[in-house]
Design a protein with these regions (language model features):
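A conserved beta-strand element that flanks and buttresses the S-adenosyl-L-methionine
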Residues: 100
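A short glycine-rich, Lys/Arg-flanked "PGG" loop and its adjoining helix->strand segment in the class I
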Residues: 114-126
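Short catalytic micro-motifs in class I SAM-dependent methyltransferases
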Residues: 103-107
Length: 203
C-alpha cells in the first residue's frame, strides 16, 4: 500500500495530476461517441488515476490491474468504482464496449501481450473498441532530458510505434493509428516529453 501511495503521488507530481493526459483521453473518448453508460475497462489501471475521466465522459468505469496492491489503493481512493486484480472477477462485468490500455504495454513482454490481447478480444463486445496509448522509443532521439524522462516509466519493453501496431494487429482489427505527446508537468511545448502512439481497433 505504501508503494502504491508513493507511485500515485509521484505520477501526480511529475504530470501536474495528469492534467494534460486527462484532457487528451477525454477528447479521445468523446471522439469515440459511445452511448452514455457504455461499459469501459481501464486495462492496467494502476492507482486509478484516470477513473474520473472515464466517469465524467459518461462511461461506466471498471479498472483492472494485476498488481493487487495498487488495486487495493484504488478502491480506497475511488470507493464508488469497480477495481479488480483477477481476470475472472473483472470479466464478470463484461462484455465491455471499450477497453483502454493507457501506457501499460511497455511493461509487458511480447509473449504475455499476446495472451492478454486474446483475453481482451474475448471480453470486448462485438462492436466494441480497443484503444492503445503507449510510449514509443525513438533511438535517433539523443536528448538526455527526454531519455531521463522516459526512465521514470520504468518500462522494460518500450517499442517503436510500428512494433506496437504489429503486435495488436495479430489479434484485433486496426482502424486508425495516430501520434501524441505527453509533456513533463503537462506543459505543452516543453522540450521534455514522451512520444506516444495511439492505436484504435475493433474486434
Amino acid at each position: 500500500m505504501i508503494w502504491a501511495l508513493v507511485n500515485d503521488l509521484g505520477q501526480r507530481a511529475v504530470s501536474l495530476n495528469k492534467w494534460e493526459q486527462r484532457r487528451s483521453l477525454r477528447r479521445r473518448l468523446q471522439t469515440l461517441a459511445l452511448p452514455p453508460g457504455s461499459k469501459a475497462l481501464d486495462f492496467g489501471c494502476g492507482t486509478g488515476l484516470f477513473a474520473s475521466t472515464f466517469s465524467r465522459s459518461g462511461l461506466t468505469y471498471h479498472g483492472y490491474d494485476i498488481d493487487s496492491g495498487v488495486v487495493s489503493y484504488a478502491r480506497r481512493m475511488y470507493p464508488g468504482q469497480v477495481f479488480a486484480s483477477a481476470r475472472e472477477e473483472i470479466a464478470h462485468y463484461g462484455p465491455f464496449d471499450l477497453v483502454v490500455a493507457n501506457c501499460c504495454f511497455h511493461h509487458i513482454p511480447d509473449d504475455v501481450l499476446a495472451e492478454e490481447l486474446e483475453w481482451v478480444k474475448r471480453i470486448l463486445a462485438d462492436r466494441g473498441a480497443f484503444l492503445l496509448i503507449d510510449i514509443v522509443v525513438r533511438p535517433e532521439d539523443r536528448s538526455v532530458l527526454r531519455r531521463a524522462f522516459r526512465t521514470l516509466e520504468r518500462g522494460a519493453f518500450l517499442r517503436r510505434a510500428e512494433e506496437y501496431v504489429a503486435i495488436v494487429a495479430r489479434h484485433l482489427v486496426v482502424k486508425r493509428v495516430g501520434e501524441d505527446r505527453s509533456y513533463m508537468l503537462s506543459i505543452p511545448g516543453s522540450p521534455v516529453y514522451n512520444d506516444l502512439v495511439v492505436v484504435e481497433c475493433g474486434k
